């Protein structure tokens, strides 16, 4: 049975001294599993095909494969995320020793398509790092079986806040914001250069144009703020503004009311596509 507790033990087996980037990778994997587990539970069978788009350290893909799922991990390791490479090597070395097998694909999501192959495709905080996320989503949709599910979590830039750098955006122009926040951006220039300001309003328009069945999760932001109370490492990873907002909302006792925030004003956003 899949669980965050089991994933935690799996990660600590690979990285007994869980500090620094391994700790971040494990926390990211646990968050990803928490979002995709409800999708897995909607499938009647156990032996299904899974694609993780933007697998990063590959820890989550490796864990799912260790539990018997047929997993493909898509990760091109672009320059802004080259720090994942040593973590990948450690995960893959462990898998080789333990006989954990899954398929690895070094490809951009915009260039990868395997029609009708996967029961579940998920991508967690990756779309905003793609040059053409809508094309990537189309490829993912075409790669789904019928029935099949596609889960995507990413920031919603209809809300003028950039979480990777913790800055409030002025308008939609990257060049304008690059000038306004030159000093802040300099420290994470590779991440900034690779960002695409994907927006709920544009994503919804695109899905309607393509006549794709979808639903945005109104509970996403509420769930995230509730998780901040339970997971101190997750809390520490958040931008200062998010931590500050959490303290205010918690002291006012209104975190549950985040469910009623209009979808266009929720960030991050969670999209579930059904085929």
Predicted features along the sequence, with ranges:
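Short, solvent-exposed loop/turn segments at secondary-structure junctions
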Residues: 57-60, 77-79, 127, 157-159, ...
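Helix-to-beta-strand junctions that scaffold the AdoMet/dcAdoMet cofactor pocket
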Residues: 130-131, 144-146
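Conserved N-terminal segment of class I S-adenosyl-L-methionine
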Residues: 1-116, 120, 264-273
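A short beta-strand submotif of the Rossmann-like class I SAM-dependent methyltransferase core
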Residues: 120-126
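A structural alpha-helix within SAM-dependent methyltransferase catalytic domains
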Residues: 62-65, 137-141
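S-adenosyl-L-methionine-dependent methyltransferase catalytic module, highlighting the catalytic core
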Residues: 88, 134-139, 149-274
């Amino acid at each position: 049975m899949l669980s965050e507790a089991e994933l935690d033990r799996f990660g600590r087996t690979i990285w007994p001294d869980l500090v620094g980037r391994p700790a971040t990778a494990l926390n990211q994997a646990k968050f990803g599993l928490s979002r995709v587990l409800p999708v897995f539970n909607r499938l009647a069978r156990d032996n299904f095909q899974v694609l993780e788009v933007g697998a990063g350290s590959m820890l989550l893909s490796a864990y799912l494969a260790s539990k018997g799922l047929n997993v493909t991990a898509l990760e091109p390791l672009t320059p802004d995320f080259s720090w994942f490479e040593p973590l990948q090597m450690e995960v893959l070395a462990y898998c080789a020793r333990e006989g954990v097998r899954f398929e690895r694909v070094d490809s951009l999501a915009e260039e990868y398509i395997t029609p009708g192959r996967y029961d579940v495709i998920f991508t967690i905080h990756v779309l905003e790092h793609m040059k053409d996320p809508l094309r990537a989503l189309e490829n993912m949709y075409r790669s789904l079986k019928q029935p099949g599910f596609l889960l995507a979590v990413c920031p919603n830039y209809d809300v003028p806040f950039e979480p990777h750098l913790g800055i409030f955006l002025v308008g939609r122009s990257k060049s304008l914001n690059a000038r306004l926040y030159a000093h802040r951006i300099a420290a994470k220039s590779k991440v900034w250069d690779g960002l695409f300001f994907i927006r709920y309003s544009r994503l919804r328009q695109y899905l309607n144009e393509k006549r794709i069945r979808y639903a945005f999760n109104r509970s996403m932001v509420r769930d995230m703020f509730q998780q901040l109370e339970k997971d101190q490492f997750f809390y520490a990873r958040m931008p200062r503004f998010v931590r500050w907002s959490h303290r205010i909302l918690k002291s006012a006792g209104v975190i549950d009311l985040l469910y009623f925030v209009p979808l266009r004003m929720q960030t991050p956003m969670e999209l579930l596509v059904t085929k």
